[in-house]
């Protein structure tokens, strides 16, 4: 919307009692981000834009999340919950600054897109004073109907007040609105509370606009995009819709998914070219996967960076702070945390690598554990380039294994190992010839029944 300034207000003051949760409704996650984060991310950004969030009293966590997602956000408190128009006026100070466009969105509609919010501003540039977002409902029962005449919105009719003909209308009110900034404040301030609940409803703005001889318009979108979240069941439905959207975007970008419906992505997952994701993979927030990488089945990744042609899994868990270099391998039943594996490093089986740096082309044998925690603090393990750690070894941090060094299988390493050295830290093997035969004979003799 070139040349037009815009203020977006996101209403996030609801208690969300039907969620039956101590967590504020808008802080529940969909695809690894809070409901509020999705809406704030979709809001217009850049030069000429401003953003406000209206939160409930005592909901500092909601305000903190808003500032975390969009540091430019202004936060306002709605001290009494007296309807949507009352909530908007909690941000009166921001509205009074006089942006060209005012967009009002809801913090519990995580599927709303930036494109839809941008489309709502176009009729304002063409002269409309109010734009309402609508959708065609598969079952419109309970929704306010949008009454349109010759392309102009004339009314929002609630279910209880609708005639039989009006109830047959499937175009429904999504709640999201955009106002011409020059007249927005005076229109919203005219909204009264002469209704059974004594609340101030934003939907009444339509009649005020019409009575003032101004124009109201409708922009349509899909029903999925404007799903509001009020229950855990609706949260699960939104997750399903979002995952379908993310999978399609990934497939369209060239990611190979053997069984897409079994793969779960985060909203911020980033893929390179020729990435392959096998069935039953869960990717949490903060994951980037570079060209040619393969994520094998039953792997779980969060806040991890996967390098070119790297391989993960099957049955691998990559926790925050994991970084795999080009061609690195993390195999089956391996867990990593705050671990850097340089190019070509291999951790193929049954291993825990935490608070560690593994040099290029190092090989970590099956059953190796970096013992990084002593009950009070975490300590680092450094493994040099080309080092070889034998199976079933314990590396007691803080410890350094030098470049090219070998650690014998079954070792407990408590001191630094120099470059190209061999470290063996285990008991010496003892062999007793014939011991097993004598042991068996003794046990069998003891089992024979005693005779009187």
From Swiss-Prot:
What superkingdom heads the lineage? Bacteria
CC cofactor: Mg(2+)
Alphabetized UniProt keyword annotations: Acyltransferase, Cell shape, Cell wall biogenesis/degradation, Cytoplasm, Magnesium, Metal-binding, Multifunctional enzyme, Nucleotidyltransferase, Peptidoglycan synthesis, Repeat, Transferase
Q: Which residues bind UDP-N-acetyl-alpha-D-glucosamine?
A: 11-14, 25, 78, 83-84, 144, 158, 173, 230, 319, 337, 352, 363
User: Does the keyword Cytoplasm feature in the UniProt annotation?
Assistant: yes
Q: Which residues bind Mg(2+)?
A: 108, 230
Q: Which sites bind acetyl-CoA?
A: 366, 372-373, 391, 409, 426
Could you tell me what the cofactor note in this record states?
Answer: Binds 1 Mg(2+) ion per subunit.
Subunit text? Homotrimer.
Functionally, this protein is described as follows:
Catalyzes the last two sequential reactions in the de novo biosynthetic pathway for UDP-N-acetylglucosamine (UDP-GlcNAc). The C-terminal domain catalyzes the transfer of acetyl group from acetyl coenzyme A to glucosamine-1-phosphate (GlcN-1-P) to produce N-acetylglucosamine-1-phosphate (GlcNAc-1-P), which is converted into UDP-GlcNAc by the transfer of uridine 5-monophosphate (from uridine 5-triphosphate), a reaction catalyzed by the N-terminal domain.
Family, according to the entry, reads as follows: In the N-terminal section; belongs to the N-acetylglucosamine-1-phosphate uridyltransferase family. In the C-terminal section; belongs to the transferase hexapeptide repeat family.
Protein's UniProt name: Bifunctional protein GlmU
* Organism of provenance: Nitrobacter hamburgensis (strain DSM 10229 / NCIMB 13809 / X14)
Q: Which gene encodes it?
A: glmU
